[in-house]
Amino acid sequence: MARRRRHRGPRRPRPPGPTGAVPTAQSQVTSTPNSEPAVRSAPAAAPPPPPASGPPPSCSLLLRQWLHVPESASDDDDDDDWPDSPPPEPAPEARPTAAAPRPRSPPPGAGPGGGANPSHPPSRPFRLPPRLALRLRVTAEHLARLRLRRAGGEGAPEPPATPATPATPATPATPATPATPATPATPATPARVRFSPHVRVRHLVVWASAARLARRGSWARERADRARFRRRVAEAEAVIGPCLGPEARARALARGAGPANSV
């Protein structure tokens, strides 16, 4: 005989527990007489610590290979990667105090006892290039010479003689210009530039008409061109006009109708 199931109505919602208590898998619901059921929660388990480095374990293999997880902030500020960074400051306890003098390290060429160390050869003295050393020596001598000259000391060395420059060929004197006697104001040593006391003025000859037309403008130049064309046409007509008259034409026809020119 089949067992008949009893129909139940809709379930009533459970009243919420006190604030701060969340029912978990390990919580127990207890009820007291004439009171609402109370929820006693067991201490929640601490979440698993995140992995030290690398992607979370729930990532796929592709994300584990290509996902970039930044490291701690202390690794980003590592000064060893930068060659020009200053050396790190020592700890407070490692810093030398005023009472305790800082020990001096021996030079690289000295041994533990203060003598020469055969493993480290002595460093060679620094030498300037020959050209720079020569220039430095000349500059030092020049400064010393100036210092002695300003102090007015006796026995100051003479300044170095300037290299002799090739003498420029003197220009031949023109016969029209008479030779002037040397005046006391003129220095005995010839200079490169000479100023003659005699001044000659040379007048430049220019075409007045061209200069006048240039001052007037283009319209005046065109008018002058038209006038010149009319003048030349009139001169040509005066020469060719007599040859085109009726008498000249009759003479030309008479010469052409002679027996020598007959067909």
UniProtKB/Swiss-Prot annotation:
Gene Ontology annotations of biological process type: response to endoplasmic reticulum stress; symbiont-mediated suppression of host autophagy; symbiont-mediated suppression of host innate immune response; symbiont-mediated suppression of host translation initiation; symbiont-mediated suppression of host type I interferon-mediated signaling pathway
Chain intervals with Basic residues compositional bias: 1-14
Motif (Bipartite nuclear localization signal): 215-233
Protein role: Inhibits the establishment of the immune response and of the integrated stress response (ISR) in the infected cell. Plays essential roles in viral nuclear egress to mediate capsid transit across the nuclear membrane. Facilitates nuclear egress cooperatively with host C1QBP and protein kinase C/PKC to induce lamin A/C phosphorylation and subsequent reorganization. In turn, lamina disassembles and nuclear egress occurs.
Self-association and partners: Interacts with host PPP1CA; this interaction to forms a high-molecular-weight complex that dephosphorylates EIF2S1/eIF-2alpha. Interacts with host EIF2S1/eIF-2alpha; this interaction is crucial for the specific dephosphorylation of EIF2S1/eIF-2alpha by PPP1CA. Binds to proliferating cell nuclear antigen (PCNA), which may release host cells from growth arrest and facilitate viral replication. Interacts (via N-terminus) with host C1QBP; this interaction allows C1QBP to be recruited to the inner nuclear membrane by ICP34.5. Interacts with host PRKCA. Interacts with protein UL31.
Disulfide bonds, paired cysteine numbers: none
Keywords: Host cytoplasm, Host nucleus, Host-virus interaction, Inhibition of host autophagy by virus, Inhibition of host innate immune response by virus, Inhibition of host interferon signaling pathway by virus, Inhibition of host RLR pathway by virus, Interferon antiviral system evasion, Modulation of host PP1 activity by virus, Repeat, Viral immunoevasion, Virion, Virulence
First and last residues of every Sequence repeat: 161-163, 164-166, 167-169, 170-172, 173-175, 176-178, 179-181, 182-184, 185-187, 188-190
Segments for region (Important for interferon resistance): 205-263
GO cellular component, one term: host cell nucleolus
Region (Disordered), start-end ranges: 1-128, 149-190
Regions of compositional bias (Acidic residues) in chain numbering: 73-83
One function term, GO molecular function aspect: protein serine/threonine phosphatase inhibitor activity
Top-level division of the source organism's lineage: Viruses
Motif Nuclear export signal: chain residues: 128-137
Region (10 X 3 AA tandem repeats of A-T-P) location: 161-190
Name of this chain's protein: Neurovirulence factor ICP34.5
Gene name of the record: RL1
The organism of origin for this protein: Human herpesvirus 1 (strain F)
Positions with biased composition (Polar residues): 24-35
This protein's domain notes: The triplet repeats region may play a role in modulating virus egress.
